[in-house]
Amino acid sequence: MAQDVLTDLKKVRNIGIMAHIDAGKTTTTERILFYTGVNYKIGETHDGASTTDWMEQEQERGITITSAAVTCFWNQNQINIIDTPGHVDFTVEVERSLRVLDGAVAVFDGKEGVEPQSEQVWRQADKYDVPRICFVNKMDKLGADFYFTVQTIKDRLGARPLVIQLPIGAEDTFEGVVDLVEMNAKVWTGETKLGEKYEVKEIPADLAEKAEQYRQELLEAVAESDEALLDKFFGGEELTIDEIKGAIRKMTVNSEAYPVLCGSAFKNKGVQPMLDAVIDYLPSPLDVENVEGHVPGKEDEVINRRPSADEPFAALAFKIAVHPFFGKLTYIRVYSGKVDSGAQVINATKGKKERLGKLFQMHANKENPVPEVSAGHIYAVIGLKDTTTGDTLCDPQNQIVLESMTFPDPVIEVSIEPKTKSDQEKLGTAIQKLAEEDPTFSVKLDPETGQTVIGGMGELHLDILVDRMKREFKVEANVGKPQVAYRETITKTVEKLEYTHKKQTGGSGQFAKVIIALEPFVGEDGAHYEFENKVTGGRVPKEYIPSVDAGAQDAMQYGVLAGYPLVNLKVTLLDGAYHDVDSSEMAFKIAGAQALKEAARKAGPVILEPMMAVEVITPEDYMGDVIGDLNSRRGQIQAMEERSGARVVKALVPLSEMFGYIGDLRSKTQGRANYSMVFDSYAEVPANVSKEIIAKATGE
């Protein structure tokens, strides 16, 4: 059976489940695995037994951190699911999984509607143009409102929802759904506690009118999408179920509309029809545009690959995980071709040969060995030495580099000091392994204190990384307080700065002269730095020019005000001079570094701080206190709105002012308000704050 599917890509779906942190995403995934026969016991996030939450910490905290890839079968179709985390500190995991998906199920909380994090994940899915269906979950919850949630999909996401189901009852009385395509009711009765079976009945009388109204809206949308159906519809003819499904599929695959279904995963209602919708409406690998890449080293030479086993092999590594027995597991999405276990391929991103070891299809953290990998599927590979997230693996004779992924810089750091010499060695191993898995995890040595400093996307992200060092790698260490990852930049242009590096003390000397210009710069793709060479007539020999560039980049690691990394600048090498005997790569590297430092001091240097987009949801009574508190934290209020009886305040607030915020917010609102925050941008700090930061950093 599985082998037949491998050859028929029409029957394959590569999907993700995406949502806000508590919308019930992991529970929904668990139910899918249960109904597709992979799981024999339903795992519950509440009791820490979920299949996809397979790291110890995920089970303790009840949140999904790493996206496990799970394969299951439904009605002769194969579904590969990537479970993505919903907590904002793990957006990199979400980006990574969206890159390799063909479609997604967006899960919403039926009471809360579209929440800040669901909005952010939705925007990321827009970026990768991923077709989606929407599942309004938790319909059994007090205050659940399907129609409100559909409205928030329109209002907050600016998306076009296509309602294809209506709920029967809500809260305690939620018992099933009205299917607007087949015009029947699917009801889960109390007899099958686990919801494996449901009854197909007539639509309840009290819903008949509403069902007819929504059915009409659905048919109009369907007819508008296809001229032949439009003629038929206005000619008074009935559209067949297949015609309706075909039109919905076309609209979904083209991201013109998003089918909306509902249910309660926790109460085992509505999951099977959602699985049917995954098959009916989300794209197979054949429906997605051919993957695009370029010739290694030649970005303007574009190559396309079809999702076919006959094409040359090309795959993207999208996740690294450390497995307790096998060591490093690399998750890959194969876009074209097929290749056997043991085959030699090339990592075209790094230009290095790799041999594919054992190949698996994964079921959370259980493995199913396979003899080969083939286009359109997701696998885990053992034995890749140099491959990291975002690298392309391909046929050595037909090389291609697929588009890579860009990851944000860390915004928060902590120092970590091993307790003993043996801990120091373990820390080295832990850092290397964790950095392989997570491109948003950064490591550096503080030159003043000699301490190791690690950086990440938020407090929870760093907590979990430190926790993993202690648990998985048995590192005993003292961890400092979280610190903000400030940056430095320049505000003025320095048109000409001359620097000569000269050392002549017996033996061979050192000589290098450079003249540079320095100006503020931000690249289109968010790049922080650019180097341009304008030297003519060999006044600086060609072989020394990369050294000037390297020196400038080295100097950017430690800024001129408080030692924070310098960003957003362009260096132009205008002129220079060299000496036949005393010039060297090292001399020009030193000259490049010193010239950059001197120019930066004259270019109006300033300190930048990470600004967070904060959203507070509070009862009306505490609105004044919440706004006053945000203002006292240097917050800029961006918007205020009403949401399901509460008030929502949106603000931009410096990260440095947000430490310990949850405690203050709870005491001000008697525990009734909550908040979420995501990194927004870097902004210049006010002069008085800048003075404090510099004084603290320089110890003055």
Swiss-Prot record:
Disulfide bonds: none annotated. PANTHER family: RIBOSOME-RELEASING FACTOR 2, MITOCHONDRIAL (PTHR43261:SF1), TRANSLATION ELONGATION FACTOR G-RELATED (PTHR43261). It is found in: Cytoplasm. InterPro entries: EFG_II, EFG_III, EFG_III/V, EFG_IV, EFG_V, EFG_V-like, EFTu-like_2, G_TR_CS. GO terms for molecular function: GTP binding; GTPase activity; translation elongation factor activity. Keywords: Cytoplasm, Elongation factor, GTP-binding, Nucleotide-binding, Protein biosynthesis. Its main location: cytoplasm. This is Elongation factor G. Catalyzes the GTP-dependent ribosomal translocation step during translation elongation. During this step, the ribosome changes from the pre-translocational (PRE) to the post-translocational (POST) state as the newly formed A-site-bound peptidyl-tRNA and P-site-bound deacylated tRNA move to the P and E sites, respectively. Catalyzes the coordinated movement of the two tRNA molecules, the mRNA and conformational changes in the ribosome. CDD domains: EF-G, EFG_III, EFG_mtEFG1_IV, EFG_mtEFG_C, EFG_mtEFG_II. Belongs to the TRAFAC class translation factor GTPase superfamily. Classic translation factor GTPase family. EF-G/EF-2 subfamily. Residues 10-286 form the tr-type G domain. PROSITE patterns: G_TR_1 (PS00301), G_TR_2 (PS51722). GO terms for cellular component: cytoplasm. One of its GO terms (biological process) is ribosome disassembly. GTP binds at residues 19-26, 83-87, 137-140.
